[in-house]
Amino acid sequence: SAVLFGDGAGAVLIEKTDSDSKLHASKMTCDPFLGEALMLKNFGTSMELKDPREGYFFGISFEGQEIFKNAVKTMARLAEEALEEAGLSIDEIDLCIPHQANLRILEATAKRCKFPMEKMIINLDQYGNTSAGSIPIALTEALEQKKVKPNSKILFLAFGGGLTGAATVVDW
């Protein structure tokens, strides 16, 4: 399996405003049972010291199919829970800004949520997986391209390290 990583960072500040902006709901989770599906063995304080010229490998263990299934299932479930708490349906969402890990994961999540791909902000092809920076970068691009309008209902979706996941619904 090949992983395409990019480099980037971003931050989003939330502040009080007189507009109709609203944070409807936010859901987070962590799966403690699939830890061995994605591991970096022999790293940090447990790392054996070796000469890097010996071709030392950190020992990443990645079960792609398990991670794929779990990411899709987790993001779809969290989206459903956040939308339910917000009192909204998926049809009322104007944009989805997901973590840009893998296009197949995003397509499968959209299909499972019955959400049109044309309403998803995708920039993975330009930057790769920028880890925690992917959502702020995609949001910035959506704002610059005028895809986010006042009162847009946005669903943010994430899945990542530690097999964590999150979904947040906002009125921009």
What do these predicted ranges mean?
Residues 1-69, 73, 77, 159, ...:
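Condensing-enzyme catalytic core mediating Claisen C-C bond formation in acyl metabolism
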Residues 29-33, 64, 93, 99, ...:
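A broad "ordered helical/assembly scaffold" signature
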Residues 67, 82-86:
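Short helix-to-loop capping/linker segments positioned immediately adjacent to catalytic or ligand/cofactor-binding
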Residues 72, 76, 83, 94-172:
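Claisen-condensing/thiolase-fold acyl-transfer catalytic domains that form or cleave C-C bonds
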Residues 87-92:
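Short, surface-exposed connector motifs at secondary-structure boundaries
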